[in-house]
């Protein structure tokens, strides 16, 4: 009986992967592989479509067909399985100022993001400040950028990884 269970599980796993969008599967596999390597002071950026392509040896850019809020949920779920790192989420403070008239969909986006933040360490900082932190970190640490199909101003989500066994407070 147990000889049948493992092959059945493998077949189901592989058939589930075949149904997934290749771009989705690629960034998720890369993130999963990188989570074993990365630690405190590494970053994950969930970026809107116009986010610049950073250069450098520690920068890896992936593309997702999902929206930023959908990718955030996927990333947070993966991070919850990891004991060695915890997310410190940073969002641009300018996001609060954008109106629905200027950027249709922004209200829904903010609401979706705000539902995921309670119980997690998160901050609002000016976009320029967060970008400086990313540029500094990229000189010494790994930064994984996941570009999404979101096209809303100031909608980038920045996650600095912190030690999972050390309370930063």
Segments from the language model and where they lie:
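Glycine-rich, aromatic-bearing surface loops/beta-hairpins
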Residues: 101-169
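C-terminal motif of bacterial Sec signal peptides marking the signal peptidase cleavage site
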Residues: 14-16
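Sec-dependent signal peptide recognition
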Residues: 1-7, 12
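Structural motif
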Residues: 42-45, 60-61, 86-90, 121-124, ...
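Feature captures the catalytic cores and cofactor-binding loops of soluble hydro-lyases/lyases
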Residues: 52-54, 61-87, 107-124
């Amino acid at each position: 009986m147990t000889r049948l269970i493992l092959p059945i599980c493998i077949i189901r796993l592989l058939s589930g992967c075949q149904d997934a969008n290749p771009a989705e599967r690629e960034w998720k596999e890369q993130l999963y592989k990188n989570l074993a390597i990365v630690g405190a002071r590494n970053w994950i950026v969930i970026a809107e479509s116009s986010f610049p392509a950073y250069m450098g040896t520690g920068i890896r850019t992936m593309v997702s067909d999902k929206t930023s809020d959908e990718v955030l949920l996927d990333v947070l779920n993966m991070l919850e399985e990891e004991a060695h790192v915890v997310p410190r989420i940073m969002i641009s403070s300018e996001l609060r100022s954008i109106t629905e008239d200027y950027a249709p969909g922004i209200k829904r986006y903010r609401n979706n993001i705000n539902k995921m933040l309670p119980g997690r360490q998160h901050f609002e900082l000016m976009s320029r400040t967060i970008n400086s932190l990313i540029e500094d970190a990229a000189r010494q640490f790994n930064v994984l950028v996941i570009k999404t199909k979101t096209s809303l101003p100031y909608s980038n989500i920045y996650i600095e990884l912190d030690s999972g066994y050390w309370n930063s407070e």
